[in-house]
Amino acid sequence: MTEQVQDENKLIAERRAKLDSIRPNCSANAHPNTFRRTHKAAELQEKYGQNTKEELEALGFRTSIAGRIMAKRGPFLVIQDVSGRIQAYAEKGVQADLKDRYQGLDIGDIIGVTGQLHLSGKGDLYVNMEEYQLLTKALRPLPEKFHGLTDQETRYRQRYVDLIVNEESRQAFVMRSKVVAAIRNFMIKKEFMEVETPMMHVIPGGASARPFITHHNALDMPMYLRIAPELYLKRLVVGGFERVFEINRNFRNEGLSPRHNPEFTMMEFYMAYADYKDLMDLTEELLSSIAIELLGSAQMPYGEHTVDFGGPYARLSMLEAIQKYNPDNATIQAMTYEQVKDLEFMRELAISLGIKIEKFWTCGQLLEEIFGETAEWQLMQPTFITGYPADISPLARRNDDNHFITDRFEFFIGGREVANGFSELNDAEDQDSRFKAQVDAKDAGDDEAMFYDADYITALEHGLPPTAGQGIGIDRLVMLFTNTHTIRDVILFPAMRPQA
């Protein structure tokens, strides 16, 4: 046991002893729930922070505040609530009473204070402790010196402590909430209807990914946590809801990384009588508007770069992007779609670039891997990548001029994918054959290939109007808006391996 752990255990024991000793003389077993706050810290700072000491004395304003003690500075207590911090002042008689009633207060304790608002000699607002009540005794101490929790793993495992002591973390999740609200409001103004579709699927579909499998006891059958809501949302378009969206969780049984969490949030939407170009225009409008609304500017810092959401955004085909970011590779510079269709050529090219290939990869998969290894990470500014091959886009409509590719794009910022959209495949027979090709791929060893969904084919046979649909990764978008570089910093409780 380390010295630090021993010290912490000693403090915990001392605090437990304090709580045990004060319980008999406190109401509600020392956990009262009768105190009512009248003002938050930020409200008082905003309304009275500019007043002079004399003005506040003359005003004689009384208030009730409540929050967690974050520091003790002589007779002053720094109290933190959801909005910010404010001080409370304990004159000598109050200090003696606190010691008598509660054996003194500790950092981390939650208290309620009622009294007159004053201004200190240093110009800080404070509430005189005329009435006060210990609301919750903190049995565990906050991190050393309260300069913030810096151990990354502890921050994620004990997010509650991280939020108490790290203002930056609190603000990141406030921004996340604002981003989601702004997206929702934008979609509603565009006449999209918010819907909810199943989280447990009989057949996993809507994306190429490995699902989580569970078991429904009453029905005695396996079920899958959804990897995407796509097929259910398109069923709604078949049913006549022409503009729908959903903000919810997806689950993919895959690895962890700075940009991947097995449980993540997506906003997915579908609009009838539109194509993938309309989606790109809508995405530009959405992102530029919420950036200006939330940050006051279409430009924002991201690491060493400045990302400009103002638009128009760059648009390149996947082949064009590979050629742009491999200027010195003569083979790539001369590459045509006819060569992209040549499996042996694509395998040799991938190997020459140091890419470890799988035997079941198609031409489209090889092209996507080459793009991912050589071009994707260089897409710092908002960029739409189009021209995705049909064999890696089983739900997307084929391009009218080049059937090898589809009317699909992925949207990149900061070197990572943030959104995926396409004109939907509404040809039931083509969808049937592509589902069958996915089944063949799964049989060949691709465990991320899709299942065959007969009911979805039946839905398409009733007629899906020309439709475009898109998914936007909320977590990755929030990473941009908060200038953070790991997805765990924007997910309140990220997936973690259990502690030994």
From Swiss-Prot:
List the catalysed reactions. Answer: tRNA(Lys) + L-lysine + ATP = L-lysyl-tRNA(Lys) + AMP + diphosphate
UniProt-annotated location(s) = Cytoplasm
Gene3D superfamilies from the UniProt entry: Bira Bifunctional Protein, Domain 2, Nucleic acid-binding proteins
Q: Which cofactor does it need?
A: Mg(2+)
UniProt binding sites for Mg(2+) 1: 410, 417
InterPro entries from the entry? Aa-tRNA-synt_II (IPR004364), aa-tRNA-synth_II (IPR006195), aa-tRNA-synth_II/BPL/LPL (IPR045864), Lys-tRNA-ligase_II (IPR002313), Lys-tRNA-ligase_II_N (IPR044136), Lys-tRNA-synth_II_C (IPR018149), NA-bd_OB-fold (IPR012340), NA-bd_OB_tRNA (IPR004365)
Q: Which Gene Ontology molecular function entries are recorded, alphabetically?
A: ATP binding; lysine-tRNA ligase activity; magnesium ion binding; tRNA binding
Query: EC number(s) of the enzyme?
Result: 6.1.1.6
Its main subcellular localisation, reduced to a broad class, is: cytoplasm
Please tell me whether the keyword Magnesium is annotated for this protein. Answer: yes
Task: Please name every pair of cysteines joined by a disulfide bond in this record.
Answer: none
Q: Does the keyword Calcium apply?
A: no
Protein name, please? Answer: Lysine--tRNA ligase
Organism for this UniProt entry: Shewanella sp. (strain W3-18-1)
Q: Please name the gene that encodes this protein.
A: lysS
